[in-house]
């Protein structure tokens, strides 16, 4: 599901709220989450999951075209850990 599909689905379910208001709310929520993570804070949504930053240590990688070694710097990457309720719902679908 893309962001546009999410906005469209939410707007369809909440017909009393203009689509532009739904779009602005989704964009604001995602922006706030990105800002929170960029400040090093963790986001926890009970029953859904948590977002945090994980550190990837510096390492030697390879250029896929040439095979040459490339030194990669350490960096922080976003990480999502699903909550138990979400895992259970996913298992119902997948099982």
From Swiss-Prot:
InterPro entries: Hist_DNA-bd (IPR000119), Histone-like_DNA-bd_CS (IPR020816), IHF-like_DNA-bd_dom_sf (IPR010992), IHF_beta (IPR005685). Gene3D superfamilies: IHF-like DNA-binding proteins (4.10.520.10). The keyword Protein transport does not apply. Keywords: DNA recombination, DNA-binding, Transcription, Transcription regulation, Translation regulation. PROSITE patterns: HISTONE_LIKE (PS00045). One of its GO terms (cellular component) is chromosome. Pfam families: Bac_DNA_binding. GO terms for molecular function: DNA binding; structural constituent of chromatin. Signal peptide: none annotated. It comes from the Bacteria. GO terms for biological process: DNA recombination; regulation of DNA-templated transcription; regulation of translation. PANTHER family: DNA-BINDING PROTEIN HU, INTEGRATION HOST FACTOR SUBUNIT BETA. Heterodimer of an alpha and a beta chain. This protein is one of the two subunits of integration host factor, a specific DNA-binding protein that functions in genetic recombination as well as in transcriptional and translational control. Belongs to the bacterial histone-like protein family. This is Integration host factor subunit beta. It comes from Erwinia tasmaniensis (strain DSM 17950 / CFBP 7177 / CIP 109463 / NCPPB 4357 / Et1/99).
